[in-house]
Each structure stands twice: as structure tokens, then as C-alpha cells.
Amino acid sequence: MIMTIKDSIQIYLEWKQTHTSSAYATYKIRLQQFEAFVKPKATLNEIDGDDIIAFHRSLENQYSLNTIAYSARVLKNFFWFWHGRGKTTFNPKEIIPIRYVSADKDIVTAEDLDDMSDLLEVNNLQDLQKKLIIHLLWDTGMRLSELLDIKIDDINEQGIDGLRTAKVRTRKSMRYNLVIWGSDTNDLMNRYLGIRLCMDCESKKLLVNPKTEKVFTPRSVQRWITELSEMANLDKKITPHSFRHGKANYILDQGGSVRDVSALLRHVKPESSFQYMQLSKKRYEDVARRYLTTFSTNALQTA
């Protein structure tokens, strides 16, 4: 049976969706883009290494090097899948994705959190929701998708120490994990739950827009955070994911290990945590400063 490129992509994506939901969408975009580029070639066996090279060269004027490298990983995984099934003679080893290190990104600090939180009033529902969201992102290091997926039933009873936990599902790995937050954040949670449980709303999600009765969109949360960071004069480009990166750096700054980062951020692969070992600009300056030799003026004059 001759395998067409269109069918091979569909079959691969269906297999991919059985164990991950977040990667499915981005894989689909890149693979369909590749399919459109290689036309009029229609079958999988017609593809060779020259097609891969030409495709990625065509992306250079429109996309970043990181995006092109990601596309290379997508195609490599795709061809490994079909190489394993014996449907292509093309050797995926010819695809060598280059790993580019992203520029130093802005992260949220504990002081940034306080500055943004101080702008919000707990007696206003919209402010309370925003305040709860940024505190949960900081305390737990959750991904935004994980936070917005939380249902009311996922939240566990409060412990005697004032801490509380919730069960979250990671779209990336399709695994359930436990997240925990502190007593200050739990005070916000209790206040919000008192209102949320009284809402006449069919949705079981924790964080819903009272006007639409639907869960908040990632774009809405991003807009809030941008507005809050500007109002707090942070002079940073803050995203919801900046809280996760900030939490990792905070753990390391407090003397925690990469193992602690891996556990608290719930990384499936331990090597994912090693990216945080790369020193931020501030931590690099602090470390370098400790090991610089300082000479007195007199010593320099007599030398």
C-alpha cells in the first residue's frame, strides 16, 4: 500500500494525540506546512533529505531560528515514526536540529508579585480573581493551561498547617500531579470559593468569567498581567510563564537544588530543570562579583 503524505500526517497526528494534547496542535501546523511545500510530491517515499533542507531554508525569511529548529525536531520525530513502521527509506538521522538558546527572558520575582498584588482589592470580584491567579502561578509554578483547567472538585481540603493542594493534569504529559500553595494564597482561595460556589454557572471550572460563565482564556490572563506589570512600573515583559521561570530561580536563590526545581515544577524529564542552571543576568553578576579580586589604590601605586 502506497502511503500518501496527507494520510501519513493524519495517522501520525492521531497517534501523537494518544499521549499528548499540547504538542498535537503545533505538530499539525508544521507538518501541514511541510506537506504544502513539497507538492506536487504526494507519497511518503518521494521525500528525501533535499526536501527537508529546502523547506527549512524557505522558512528563514519569515521565522526565527528557534522556530526552524523546532520544525526540524517535528519532522525528525515524524520520519522516525514511519521509518520504524518500514514505510519510508529516508533516514531521519539526516535531520539534525540545532538547539538554540533563547535570549535571557524576564522573570517574576517575589518583589514583582507584591507590587502587582498591592494594586488589587480583595473586595472586588475581578480584582480578587486576578490576585488569586497571580498568587497561584507564583506559589505553584503551574503552567497557565494547568491553572485554567482546574475544576472546583480538584481542590482538596485545607490542611491543619493552612496549606492546600489541588490535582492538576499536565497537557504536555497527560499526567496528574499535585500542586500546593501557601496560607496567604489560601486565604484568597477561600474568599473566592465563597463567591464561586454561589455563581449560577454550569461550568465546573474554578476560574470563570461571571459575565460569560465560561473559563477565562489564556489571552485574557496575558492581557491582565501585561496591564498589572505596566501599572506596577516593572519595566519587564511579563507573561504567565514568567511566574514559572521566576519560581525556579527563586528556589535556586534560596539554596534549593535542580532536583527541588524538577519536583516542584513537575518536570517529567529531569534534564528540563537544568535550563534554570544557566545564570540569569543578575545572578551571574552576583556570582562573578564574589570571585573578582579587588586591589586597593595603594597596592596598585606600589606595584
Task: Name the predicted role of every residue range.
Residues 1-303:
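Conserved catalytic core of the tyrosine transesterase superfamily
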